[in-house]
Amino acid sequence: MPRKGPVKPREIMPDPIYRDVLVHKLINKVMVDGKKSKAEKIVYGAMQILAEKTGEQPLEALHKAIENLKPILEVRPRRVGGATYQVPMEVPPRRQISLALRWLVEAARNRSGRGNYTMLEKLSNELLDAYHNRGNAIKKREDTHRMAEANKAFAHYKW
């Protein structure tokens, strides 16, 4: 741990087109090998497709999809007397966003189908699924909540 006190989180600048921090974070999650312009094309294209299919503004549709993906509870390991318990805990707001974005991009990358789908198509389909509360990323959130519910008996071990 640093001796100078807690480390302040860096401020993330909003993206140039939508002027939104969440879009910038999504671009950074999609980016591979530092190819940011490619990641921007993928994210902006996916947002346009999402807006066309939902009939909402691209930014509103993205925010709703991410809101649907945010986990409320998760389990964290806690050692008590030689045994490790999975203790359900509330997820802090910053972690909710980072988990939601991670699950979204992971689900889009693992998404398969007939034909050669581009990452743009995969991401837009996964965003649309998240918007409608379905898909692999939503399944991941539900699994996390199910684990927390199953281990509710250990909730008194919170620290």
From Swiss-Prot:
It holds the Pfam family Ribosomal_S7. One of its GO terms (biological process) is translation. It comes from the Bacteria. Keywords: Ribonucleoprotein, Ribosomal protein, RNA-binding, rRNA-binding, tRNA-binding. One of its GO terms (molecular function) is rRNA binding. Gene3D superfamilies: Ribosomal protein S7 domain. SUPFAM superfamilies: Ribosomal protein S7. InterPro entries: Ribosomal_uS7, Ribosomal_uS7_bac/org-type, Ribosomal_uS7_CS, Ribosomal_uS7_dom, Ribosomal_uS7_dom_sf. GO terms for cellular component: small ribosomal subunit. Belongs to the universal ribosomal protein uS7 family. One of the primary rRNA binding proteins, it binds directly to 16S rRNA where it nucleates assembly of the head domain of the 30S subunit. Is located at the subunit interface close to the decoding center, probably blocks exit of the E-site tRNA. Part of the 30S ribosomal subunit. Contacts proteins S9 and S11. This is Small ribosomal subunit protein uS7. It comes from Sulfurihydrogenibium sp. (strain YO3AOP1). The lineage of its organism: Bacteria, Pseudomonadati, Aquificota, Aquificia, Aquificales.
